[in-house]
Amino acid sequence: MKKTIFAFFLLMLTISIFLCSCTPNDTVSNSLSVDNSEIVSKLEETSSEESEPEESRVMITIKDNADYKNVALEKSYKRTSLYPNDDSPSYPDVNGKEMTDGKLPSATASYSDGSYMGFNKNSEDYVLNGYSSITVDLGELHHLDKFVSYTGSDAFESVGISAPAMVVVYVSEDGVAWNKLGESKYECEDGSKLGRFVLETEYAVSGQYVQYRFVGNLNWMMIAEVEAYGVTSDESIPFYKTENEFSFLFIGNSTTYYFNIPYEFMKITESAGVNTDVTLCTYGGAYLSQFADGTTTMGKLLKEKLAATKYDFIVLQDNGNADYSDSKPAMDKLIPMVEKNGAKPVLYKRYSSNDDPAQRPSSALRHHKNYNKLAKDFNIDMNAPVADAFLICNQKYPSINLYHTDNSHHSAVGAYLSACVMAMTFLDIDEDDITYNANLEPDVAAKLRECARIAIETGYDFPES
């Protein structure tokens, strides 16, 4: 017994000596160190505690049931706003019944066909939330395993209409607490003007409400029908999660929602094996002060989102013209709201939106100072250095254009780079574990991931003054 105790003492002494020999300089980081111990801890806890053992999971299959059918047919639904408004939409939802009436346009029908309803990325709800949605009330609890949404295809691209970039499906038993089922798979025959998004689950889930979230690609998305297949049942099935899921709320403006940065982030993390769910609270040109003000549309929406959902992370991004004197008072109000929700506040150190490339380093320096000071003052240890990554990429790979045609907003390429920086910063995802390329050439995507890593490890060489 004494020998065992002595051996254990020697082991602990060896470990202590080793740890003491490691200096802070052994770890290279950006200007603010990132402590991901909470993330690792949560992943470990989830794998051992939160995920139910496979043998305890309720596994019900329903496709062979004689009553299996599209249970959303002719059911009532709610949708987000149309464009330019619900009173005079360009592509209306006649009588609020077209999306579940069972009537589909032909594969050759025009986008103006009466079976289509149009969602636009410039509608108020889309700008605020980052998606348009249709929420079907099935009237009572059902067991469900297949979800379909019919949309116009990319055949209409010449007029600014395309298939959605993605359709994500959620279910709820009460219309308040939502469970994300996942992203639907796009199917479309060659030459067809009608496509569909399909999501099938291995086993049935229970729900009375089904929500289809449509994330845009071009400005317009034409939606023809939504379906949910299953059977009526009063048995509630506990929702099963096979992996840990982190929920993120992104607060900001077009620097966040242009080219769907949060959804690119979601695809990147999931390609690396980390499940995420994203929600937006954004508005074009918005300042954080407007979200902190509970009397504004943005402030009211943020309060609603914080009251309805517990988030793991809340990402904060301010207007390009904001300096510390603007951001600090807003953060004084926002941080207590974030902490009350139980979320971890993190920062998106924005890139320069100056349309003159020669002025971008000095403009980015202003953001660098502002966000780093905010991080220090509010003890925020995760500050995604997107500003650094843009400048590093411009230095190393000047042929890669990160900006949109307006030379101010980021492009789809810039969105991918931004999302990579956030995935690596917030969730400690390794550059080599990311397999999603966002339809970019593999070598270009690899270069962007490299720039993201460099931005996090060493940062851009900003001048001290």
What does each model-found stretch correspond to?
Residues 364-456, 460-462:
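Catalytic His-Asp segment of secreted/periplasmic serine-dependent ester chemistry enzymes
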